[in-house]
Amino acid sequence: MLRTLPEHAFRRRARVVAAVFCALCLGLAVRLFSLQLRSDGWYTHRALGQQLRDTVVPADRGKIYSADGVLLAANSSCWTLRASPREMPEEKLSLAADGLADILGLDAAALLEKFSDRRSNDCLLRYRVDRETADKVRDLCEANGITGIRINQDSKRWYPQGQFLASVLGFTNVDNAGVSGLELKYDGLLTGENGVVLTAVNAWGYTLEQSYETERFPTEGDGLRLTIDANIQHYLENALGYAVQEHHVAARAVGIVMDVNTGAVLAMSTTPSYDPNEPRVIFDAAARTQVEALSGGARAAALQLAQQTQWRNKAVSDLYEPGSVFKLITCAAALDTGAVNQHSSFYCGESISVAGTRFHCANHKRHGAQTVTQALENSCNQSFIQIGARLGKEAFCSYFAAFGLREPTGIDLPAEPKKSLYYTADRMGPVELASCAFGQSSKVSYLEMAAAVCAVVNGGKLMQPYVVSDILAPDGSLIEHIAPTCTRQVLKAETSATMREMMEAVVLYGGGRNAQIAGYRVGGKSGTSQKLDSADEKARIASFVAVAPIDDPQFLCLVCLDEPHSWTTAGGSLSAPVCAEVLEQTLVYKGIPRAAVPGAAPTEPTAADLPADGDSFDGA
């Protein structure tokens, strides 16, 4: 028998139910308020993420031009191929896999496996194919009713001059980001702002036929105009390439041409080079042969090393012992301090002993009594040991630093060494001072040496080397001009004038006779430095630095052949003619008239002038 609840109990229960219902309604209202107002942005963002597909439209990188307007780096159209297996007709998966494999050189079975994964809405087929390949894929799809293959227009970096200036320009990766050279140093400036296309899609990721598209157009990056003159660069690359082949240079060669008064780099080459359009292809035949002879892990390691070697800008990144070219620095410092003058006399005998270590000139030739000028002409080690001793280690180290040989030059290129290898005064004894005075026992970069010699001849100013003269807007208009920078005054102007006279004497009467140019006054200095860290005790670097016109200095050319295998390793014989060829073409190109020049005609040195093969230290 059912019991009837008392009225007061019923009302109490009704109130409880009503309260619970009201609480639930209030909670629901609060939650709805939170969802609609407080969390509206979050859910809107999630919804848009599901309803829209954004396709990036890559921006072109900024263009790079030479000083004389030659296009060095630009962009070319290419196409990236992608597939959406969800959208591909199931009955045509095999046909699509076979056709695309044939066009793209891919594995058909692997493609079919990708296409059979119906959960996938996007898979990459091939990056950056050319127009012909993209057209073949498009024709295949249209002829066979294959849907789900997307052909997206893309952009890739293009170097219209091929190997020209490759070590300076560098290259980009598949994402169009700079990897080396100017492409890396100025990556942020050259990189543009990507565009985007937004397309509506359904819940399964299919593009809606009755959808909308919105587009933000890409913006091209800013461009660069270089100090590099394409004509002078051609002169340097051609002459250096011939020298590398003629003298069987094993460890690449370096050439630098600079404006001595501004620090602007007019040409820079590391030879052999590579093609930045195909940076992973080894262009040095000898290195390529060595790699191809290996297999497995050894081959992969050798290939990586060969690639990194050819990408390396030796002129900026490598250190070397400058040899007798460095005598210009020792001589300039000694003259500037008053430790010696042009007519100070020194004696060169069979050898000289310093703290129990005997030194001799590389050709074992006794020069006898000679002035400082004659010692420079003869590149006499013994005399420069005595000059270094008069200068003293404190002053020597002070000028070494003042010439910028202990710090990066600050050039606007990547991978410059943070410091060179040198002795400080507290670590330098008499033997170290002796060997450093004639260019051994210290290591500097090729660019540091070139910049230091510019300071020797330009009135004593150390100028910061640079390769970019202007920043350009995408339309070619000027954004910023880069002005030359003087780091410091190193020498007195009169010391620099004296050094110019002495350097001309080296070319007229000394070891630089092969750098003479008919109708132009030239100054220079040779060097043949031993590679003390090489397993081959006969390994040498043959170098020469030349400046013209020496009476009104404008252009410097430094040429270094690393490990030549020729009839000699003397820089005055192998590298001086290269400097002469490059400078003569440059002077003519720049419209500098010839004039009568006193002095001897270029002559090949005799055997007595050349260093003996077994010498332990540098000679002329």
Predicted regions and their residues:
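Beta-lactam-recognizing serine transpeptidase/beta-lactamase-like catalytic domain environment
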Residues: 73, 202-214, 260-325, 329-561, ...
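Periplasmic/cell-envelope proteins involved in peptidoglycan metabolism and beta-lactam response
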Residues: 1-294, 310, 319, 394-404, ...
